[in-house]
Regions:
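A structural motif corresponding to the C-terminal end of an alpha-helix
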Residues: 42-49, 187
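Short beta-strand to alpha-helix junction loop
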Residues: 16-41, 168-179
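Flavin-binding catalytic cores
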Residues: 148-153, 158-204
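Glycine-centered tight beta-turn/hairpin loop motif at sheet-sheet or coil-to-beta transitions
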Residues: 68-71
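N-terminal FAD cofactor-binding segment of flavoenzymes
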Residues: 1-14
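Anionic-ligand binding region
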Residues: 123-152, 156, 164-166
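Central helical "cap/lid" subdomain
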Residues: 73-128, 190
Length: 206
């Protein structure tokens, strides 16, 4: 649907799978302008308040009252929480059905590093899936053709097993970031002295 609407496009190019796992559908779709096009498309006709902290949410018989840190009160017929299940249970427990609270939902951590290499030649590879205990996947952001850059931009994704061991201290311990990058350098041959930017994000529940 969103492909026909030209909100999404096919991510073409070579997607290397070094795990040699058989895939039935190799077509990969990505947002034409970014990763959040699905959210933007389905909320484009809805009023929004960005960078507003929610202080309280209360149900008033017929509607919800959402109080923001600006003291503004937003009234709504429905409230949708988009947060991990463990956090949802804490912040909305009194509004949730008991059956929902008893669900056994497994959330897994993820650590991702964005890294840029100066003046690297564009290589004909869009993504690489690794058979490794630390680094499992890397995406060539240049191959998505959302922008033009003389630098080589990559997103590196950790394995779930390794993320479980590292998620609680990745911000303070630079060895976590360095390990992901080191693995990528070893696999691809990119040079460490060409790195001009690196940034790591972690999600305890993903």
């Amino acid at each position: 649907f969103l492909y026909k609407k030209k909100e999404m496009k096919i991510w073409d190019g070579n997607h290397l799978d070094l795990t040699f796992e058989k895939k039935e559908n190799n077509i990969k779709f990505i947002g034409k302008k970014g990763n959040n096009v699905i959210c933007k498309y389905y909320t484009k006709k809805i009023r929004k308040n960005f960078q507003s902290q929610v202080k309280s949410i209360n149900y008033n018989k017929h509607f919800w009252e959402i109080k923001l840190n600006t003291e503004k009160i937003v009234k709504a017929r429905s409230v949708i929480f988009t947060c991990p299940y463990p956090q949802l249970k804490k912040i909305a427990r009194k509004y949730l059905d008991k059956k929902f609270l008893k669900l056994k939902i497994t959330m897994e951590p993820n650590i991702t590093t964005m890294v840029a290499f100066k003046n690297q030649k564009n290589i004909p590879v869009s993504s690489i899936k690794f058979n490794d205990e630390v680094l499992t996947w890397a995406a060539n952001e240049n191959s998505k053709k959302r922008f033009k850059s003389s630098n080589s931009l990559w997103t590196l994704q950790s394995s779930v097993k390794w993320a479980k061991k590292s998620i609680n201290f990745y911000k303070k311990n630079k060895n976590v970031e360095n390990m992901l990058i080191s693995k990528f350098l070893n696999f691809t041959g990119f040079k460490k002295n060409k790195i001009i930017f690196k940034k790591t994000h972690g999600w305890k529940y993903s």
